[in-house]
Regions:
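Conserved HGGG/HGGXW glycine-rich cap/lid loop of the alpha/beta-hydrolase fold
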Residues: 63-108
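Flexible "cap/lid" loop of the alpha/beta hydrolase fold
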Residues: 148-155, 164-191
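Short beta-strand/loop motif that positions the catalytic acidic residue
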Residues: 222, 228-230, 234
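Active-site loop/oxyanion-hole signature of alpha/beta-hydrolase fold enzymes
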Residues: 101-138
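Active-site nucleophile elbow and catalytic-triad environment of alpha/beta-hydrolase enzymes
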Residues: 202-218
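Catalytic histidine-centered segment of alpha/beta-hydrolase-like enzymes
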Residues: 263-272
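An N-terminal hydrophobic leader/cap segment in hydrolases
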Residues: 10-50
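Conserved loop-alpha-helix segment in the C-terminal half of the alpha/beta-hydrolase fold
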Residues: 91, 232-256
Length: 290
């Protein structure tokens, strides 16, 4: 009996300790001070900024000249603005663009821990875009779940954006894996066991599986150039999403598709040169517009 009692207490202490540990780690973010030091080592000045909307703080980082067109990056799940730190330090890109990367709602330093639906994320992120409006073209780039976020932004505010680049984006509701286990960790006390950023990540993925069906009806409004870049060996987001996107955008003559043979889900980092090359072509697009 004593052993059983000690075992139960030990198990309880373990779970309490795990819950405390889980909420304090794996947040997938760095402090502004750490990031500032990294930029300064490269001789770059980064600005760390916050927009407040209805009691929610949205954190984002900006590099480059405010007189230039904007590359606006939206990260996947989990993640934070620094997923695109390398691009924000790139001297070739900075010759042509101001670069902004945002902590999506629920991640980084943007109301960390609370998941938001797709439409709510678009409304909040657009507040950053409005604040940073410099009357120059804005190009949206989204990776993974950042893909449907930028599609939602473009559907809601079609006149605001010059182009979309969808990197391994999960936009097809019919190609989403069922993953019923996620619902257990969203709608039961087991959610307390999810560490750090994995909790809002799991919650928003559950939301997005339904939200994508609403997104499905708004593609007719997208007339701007749209580029899909995807690996055909992506195990997280199937390359079938590209075919879905093409089928929804048959009215748009400005669709470009780059399928990378053998590439996984992590193309922003593993195929940096290819993606940077694509982004540099957007500068030529801006010149033609002027």
């Amino acid at each position: 009996m004593k052993f059983k009692k000690k075992f139960k207490w030990g198990l309880l202490i373990f779970f309490i300790s795990w819950i405390i540990f889980a909420q304090s780690c794996m947040k997938f973010r760095i402090t502004d001070g750490q990031a500032k030091a990294e930029f300064e080592q490269r001789g770059l000045h980064a600005r760390f900024l916050t927009v407040k909307e209805e009691g929610i703080s949205l954190h984002y980082v900006k590099t480059g000249s405010d007189s230039l067109p904007t590359l606006f990056f939206v990260h996947g799940s989990p993640g934070s603005w620094d997923a695109f730190k390398g691009y924000m330090m790139d001297s070739a890109l900075l010759q042509h663009f101001r670069i902004i990367s945002v902590d999506r709602p629920g991640f980084g330093y943007s109301d960390f821990g609370t998941a938001y639906h797709l439409t709510d994320q678009a409304v909040l992120i657009n507040k950053v875009i409005q604040k940073e409006d410099n009357q120059k073209p804005v190009h949206l780039i989204g990776h993974s779940i950042g893909g449907p976020v930028i599609v939602q932004l473009a559907q809601d505010y079609p006149a605001e954006f010059a182009s979309l680049t969808i990197l391994a984006g999960s936009i097809s509701p019919k190609d989403e894996p069922k993953e019923y286990w996620r619902y257990v960790f969203t709608y039961s006390p087991l959610k307390l066991l999810m560490p750090g950023a994995f909790k809002p990540s799991n919650d928003e993925i559950v939301y997005f599986k339904k939200d994508l069906y609403s997104l499905d009806t708004g593609y007719a409004d997208l007339q701007m150039p749209i580029t899909f870049i995807h690996g055909d060996a992506d195990k997280f987001v199937t390359v079938k999403n590209v075919e879905y996107g093409k089928s929804k955008l048959q009215h748009n003559p400005h669709i470009k598709v780059i399928i990378i043979p053998g590439a996984s889900h992590f193309i922003p980092w593993q195929y940096y040169s290819l993606i940077r090359g694509h982004l540099l072509t957007l500068s030529a697009m801006d010149s033609e517009r002027n």
